[in-house]
Every structure is written in structure tokens, then in C-alpha cells.
Regions:
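The feature captures the LRR N-terminal capping module
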Residues: 1-117, 121-125
Length: 128
């Protein structure tokens, strides 16, 4: 059983209830809905090293989320749903295929945006 599979099994069984950091980095093709079981406690979510190209529209259900890493995935644009996560301070989408960063994807409280090794030609004027 892979580490990610074991972590998902532990998440499904409730063994991870109350954790503040979750690392799921091992070839996931879609966002595991089980993550929402941690909605009231999760602060750091690492989904790097997967095959993701989108995040769920209801990501803001993770009300305490401060940091999200989605490096080395298949994103072509920074997901606009990130702006609905009001506690989000750090976003890392290194080594994807991001070409576009829409102003609507930038959360007002965002302090760090990591887009190294992408294909972004311009950033929104709202980023200073």
C-alpha cells in the first residue's frame, strides 16, 4: 500500500481527525473529497507531486487553511477558488504549466505566491 493510499484510508476511518497538516503527494488524479473531513482543523495542505489540474469549487470549506502547495501537478492556470479561502497566506504552484494568473485567483490576505518553473508571462497589477 502506498503512503498516499494509507493516508487516505486513515482519513476515511477518522484516524486523522484534528490534524493541522496533511501531505498527499503520490499521483492523485483528483482532489480527495475526504480532505473535507478536516475542514475545521486543517491549516497546511500539500498536494505536490500529483496529476491534479483543478481544485474543488468548495475549497473554502477548509476554513482554517493557511498554506496550500500544489507544485508538480498539471495546472495551467492559478485556480480562482483560492481567493475564496480567506485565511490563505501562502500558495505554492511550482513546476506546473501555469500560463495565466487571473486577479480573481489572488486572495486579499495572500503573502507568498510561489510560481517558479511555470510559463507565466505577466502577473496581475494587484500583486505588489
Amino acid at each position: 500500500m502506498t503512503t498516499t493510499a494509507a493516508t487516505l484510508d486513515a482519513l476515511r476511518s477518522g484516524e486523522l481527525k484534528g490534524i493541522t497538516r496533511l501531505d498527499l503527494a503520490c499521483g492523485l488524479e483528483e482532489f480527495p473529497r475526504e480532505i473535507f473531513e478536516l475542514a475545521d482543523t486543517l491549516e497546511v495542505l500539500n498536494l505536490s507531486g500529483n496529476l491534479l489540474s483543478e481544485l474543488p469549487d468548495d475549497l473554502s470549506r477548509l476554513s482554517k487553511l493557511r498554506v496550500i502547495f500544489c507544485s508538480e501537478n498539471r495546472f495551467t492556470q492559478l485556480p480562482e477558488v483560492l481567493s475564496s479561502c480567506v485565511q490563505l497566506e501562502m500558495v505554492g504552484f511550482k513546476a506546473n504549466a501555469i500560463r495565466e494568473v487571473a486577479p480573481a485567483a489572488i486572495s486579499p490576505g495572500l503573502r507568498w505566491l510561489i510560481l517558479t518553473d511555470n510559463q507565466v508571462s505577466a502577473l496581475p497589477a494587484s500583486i505588489s
